């Protein structure tokens, strides 16, 4: 089987054609030990991770399969005014893999969703929304400052204020209505969901601290500060550290 594949498919949730990249371990005798759905930063296509990390090397040394859908403007969320990227991530991607690569046999207990920037928030939200699909999520970098986006004091080079309103809707004061991931986490903890989380930022940052506090009710959360200004500049370093956290050492 080729280590890198491009799968083009129709995504019913988006009602349009979509594409994902798949990176498999190159060693035929190496069992697949876990699957990692990788989301690039906001606005990125399915090739972003291929261009920014040595995924073939990491897949072959860790026994991991990497799955990379296009992020575009959705960041792993269903848009308030636009496409249902969240549903496509949690549903269409898995249906297509069952059809095209049934030998992967993805299992929820070994499937992670990983994101950068606002897609890191999308990854956390995806795992909390569908704990039947994922065993956990990683936000490679600090949890985005939701309050700053909510009051209009933060945006990104791709997600302008207008695009943010399309993504998350708009409150009466005109600011984007941002999903409250901490509330969703608290709900899942009460339900006894079996999830794990990795946050690649400083534990003292407000949103990271709030997320960890909510995790203290029973859901494991690991915070790793690698001292980098932004993980988007060195994504492979964060990804390698996350693999050390999420994938048990091979015998």
Where are the regions a protein language model picked out?
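Non-catalytic cap/lid and distal C-terminal segments of serine-dependent acyl enzymes
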Residues: 1-251
């Amino acid at each position: 089987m080729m280590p890198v594949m491009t799968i083009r498919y129709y995504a019913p949730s988006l009602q349009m054609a979509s594409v994902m990249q798949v990176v498999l371990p190159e060693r035929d005798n190496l069992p697949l030990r876990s699957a990692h759905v990788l989301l690039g930063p906001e606005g990125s296509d399915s090739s972003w991770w291929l261009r920014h990390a040595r995924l073939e090397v990491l897949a072959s040394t860790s026994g991991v399969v990497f799955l990379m859908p296009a992020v575009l403007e959705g960041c792993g969320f269903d848009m308030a005014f636009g496409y249902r990227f969240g549903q496509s991530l949690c549903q269409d991607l898995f249906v297509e893999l069952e059809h095209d690569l049934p030998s992967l046999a993805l299992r929820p207990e070994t499937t992670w969703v990983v994101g950068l920037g606002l897609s890191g928030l999308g990854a956390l939200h995806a795992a909390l929304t569908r704990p039947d699909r994922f065993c956990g999520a990683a936000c490679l970098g600090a949890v985005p400052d939701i309050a700053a986006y909510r009051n209009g004091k933060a945006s990104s080079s791709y997600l302008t204020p207008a695009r943010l309103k399309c993504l998350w809707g708009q409150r009466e004061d005109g600011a984007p209505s941002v999903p409250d991931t901490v509330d969703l986490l608290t709900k899942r903890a009460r339900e006894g969901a079996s999830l794990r989380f990795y946050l690649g930022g400083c534990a003292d940052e407000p949103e990271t601290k709030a997320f960890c506090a909510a995790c203290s009710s029973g859901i494991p959360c690991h915070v790793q500060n690698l001292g980098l200004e932004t993980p988007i500049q060195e994504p492979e370093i964060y990804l390698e550290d996350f693999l050390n956290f999420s994938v048990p050492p091979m015998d």
